[in-house]
Curated annotation (Swiss-Prot):
Organism expressing this protein natively: Saccharopolyspora erythraea
GO-annotated molecular function: 3 iron, 4 sulfur cluster binding; 4 iron, 4 sulfur cluster binding; electron transfer activity; metal ion binding
Required cofactor names: [4Fe-4S] cluster; [3Fe-4S] cluster
NCBIfam families from the UniProt entry: FdxA_Actino
Task performed by this protein: Ferredoxins are iron-sulfur proteins that transfer electrons in a wide variety of metabolic reactions.
Entry binding sites for [3Fe-4S] cluster: C9, C17, C50
Protein name: Ferredoxin
Length: 106
């Protein structure tokens, strides 16, 4: 099990979670952040600092955002396991359902 970032993060990208993550497993996509499921150690440090409450334990993701569990896995299909977001930097792409969403927060 791991933590998942869901739709409230889209077009917000606050990044407070990145600063809290002790293992650097939160990667920046084009429109939202993604938690690497193999690099996350399930510490939960990211969850309480998210100002839009977009981070959930995998088993607790609300049904309306269930697709984001798969999105957090799919984002890393091309990227693999680079061993830390800092060495990768921003990855200017997103996966479904994020890539097909209209701009959020407007």
């Amino acid at each position: 099990m791991t933590y998942v970032i869901a739709e409230p993060c889209v077009d917000v990208l606050d990044k407070a979670c990145i600063e809290e993550c002790p293992v650097d497993c939160i990667y920046e996509g084009g429109r939202m952040l993604y938690i690497h499921p193999d690099e996350c150690v399930d510490c939960g440090a990211c969850e309480p600092v998210c100002p839009v409450e977009a981070i959930y334990y995998e088993d607790d993701v609300p049904d309306e955002w269930a697709a984001y569990t798969k999105a957090n896995v799919d984002f890393f299909d091309e990227l693999g396991s680079p061993g830390g977001a800092a060495k990768v930097g921003k990855v200017d792409r997103d996966v479904e359902p994020v890539s097909s969403l209209p701009p959020q927060g407007e």
